[in-house]
């Protein structure tokens, strides 16, 4: 159901590779019955220097993360915050790749279902030429402050997602399966909206976090 709990999240990282690079910030909001009910915002100590280009993009520098908890401490808290919810992100493949890789690295078993708001935007806003977060926000008259800061991007994405839920209901779409079918059938859609699923199994009992 589209009224199920969702956790809309965004991460900032030291680069684009989930294997080679590290998370430096996680921001998330929990959406239940179409309203934001809780927020999660934390810096993460990547244990490596933040590249200058990332500092320029995000405004996050080494002094801001040096006293922060590491991903080993932060990730279980984020997963607890997200418990029982479908994950949502803008360009979700990128954000989820880091979450999935870190779960594997820490031996955390996890079963994710997640939705990409880029796919939703392509279906519901076919007149747009680009689907970047700031472009979609502008089209929906949603303000985006401090772009490329995780909690602000997550809050903006949540507002977008709540509007998308309303737009779906106006089209008599009330669950993810019907949404998938609508995405496939829309002549304007660039690609269908996938509901992604990822299952991470701990490879050994050693270092496993429950």
Segments (PLM) and residue ranges:
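Conserved non-catalytic scaffold segment of RNase H-like nuclease domains
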Residues: 1-112, 126-148
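Phosphodiester-processing cores and adjacent nucleic acid-binding clamps
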Residues: 7, 92-93, 97-99, 103-148, ...
């Amino acid at each position: 159901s589209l009224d199920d709990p969702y956790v809309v999240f965004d991460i900032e990282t030291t680069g684009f590779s989930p294997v080679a690079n590290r998370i430096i910030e996680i921001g998330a909001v929990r959406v239940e019955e179409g309203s934001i009910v809780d927020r999660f915002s934390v810096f993460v100590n990547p244990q490596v220097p933040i590249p200058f280009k990332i500092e320029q993009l995000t405004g996050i520098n080494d002094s801001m993360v040096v006293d922060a908890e590491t991903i080993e401490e932060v990730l279980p808290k984020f997963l607890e915050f997200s418990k029982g919810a479908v994950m949502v992100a803008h360009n979700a493949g990128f954000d989820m790749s880091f979450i999935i890789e870190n779960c594997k690295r820490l031996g955390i078993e996890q079963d994710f279902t997640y939705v990409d708001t880029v796919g939703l935007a392509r279906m519901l806003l076919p007149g747009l030429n680009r689907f970047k977060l700031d472009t979609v926000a502008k089209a929906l008259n949603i303000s985006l402050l401090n772009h490329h800061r995780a909690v602000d991007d997550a809050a903006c994405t949540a507002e977008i997602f709540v509007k998308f839920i309303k737009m779906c209901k106006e089209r008599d779409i009330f669950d993810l399966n019907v949404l998938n079918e609508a995405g496939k059938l829309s002549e304007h859609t660039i690609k269908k909206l996938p509901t992604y699923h990822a299952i991470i199994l701990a490879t050994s009992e050693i270092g496993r976090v429950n």
